[in-house]
Amino acid sequence: MIQISDKAQTYFRKLIEREGVPGMGVRLSAVDAGTPRADAKLEFAEPADLSGDEWAIDCDGFTLYVVAASVPWMDGAEIDYVTQSTGNQQLTIKAPKIKGEAPAESASMVERVRWVVENEINPQLASHGGRVAVQEVSAEGVVLLRFGGGCHGCGMADVTLKQGIEKTLMGRLPGVIAVRDATDHATGDAPYIPRDSAA
């Protein structure tokens, strides 16, 4: 179920009236759903823009159309038009399921490791243009990772592995006993910090 506040409905209605297009509504979709990059997208939608499989939510003076593939990701979403402490007004969308949900404790260790890597570790590494991919998780709980981007060949990869990634995975996932690097760092062509510079 999606909640859209009266203030948000008034805001949309005024914008739609200004456009003056009969039957115009607002279309809501999830972009990159289930990933750390997930976001909600709102756009005007004329009747000809609709595919016909959208979920229609009748609002005061217009219809909110939710793209069918986005419905599960938008469950529990709240759309509001709020006044910030600075006095500015802003449209807000809170969609708690849009980035996906962490796997249950009963999920495999591989699924849980991948979730933490994609949702906690890689967003931090992205600030340096880096990333890691899970290559393997052994039955004993040893995680084998492969660095990429700015982390591939980086002189600080060992520190990142031990003080950042291993600490995070072992702290979040009981059962992970070690994290190892499977990357051939000599082949990195654009490291964040070249290996010969890190001392």
Curated annotation (Swiss-Prot):
Binds 1 [4Fe-4S] cluster per subunit. The cluster is presumably bound at the interface of two monomers. Keywords: 4Fe-4S, Iron, Iron-sulfur, Metal-binding. GO terms for biological process: iron-sulfur cluster assembly; protein maturation. It comes from the Bacteria. InterPro entries: Fe/S_biogenesis_protein_NfuA, FSCA_dom_sf, HesB-like_dom_sf, NIF_FeS_clus_asmbl_NifU_C. The keyword Lipid biosynthesis does not apply. Gene3D superfamilies: Fe-S cluster assembly (FSCA), HesB-like domain. The keyword Membrane does not apply. Its cofactor is [4Fe-4S] cluster. One of its GO terms (molecular function) is 4 iron, 4 sulfur cluster binding. [4Fe-4S] cluster binds at residues 151, 154. Involved in iron-sulfur cluster biogenesis. Binds a 4Fe-4S cluster, can transfer this cluster to apoproteins, and thereby intervenes in the maturation of Fe/S proteins. Could also act as a scaffold/chaperone for damaged Fe/S proteins. Homodimer. PANTHER family: FE_S BIOGENESIS PROTEIN NFUA, IRON-SULFUR CLUSTER SCAFFOLD PROTEIN NFU-RELATED. Belongs to the NfuA family. This is Fe/S biogenesis protein NfuA. It comes from Xanthomonas campestris pv. campestris (strain ATCC 33913 / DSM 3586 / NCPPB 528 / LMG 568 / P 25).
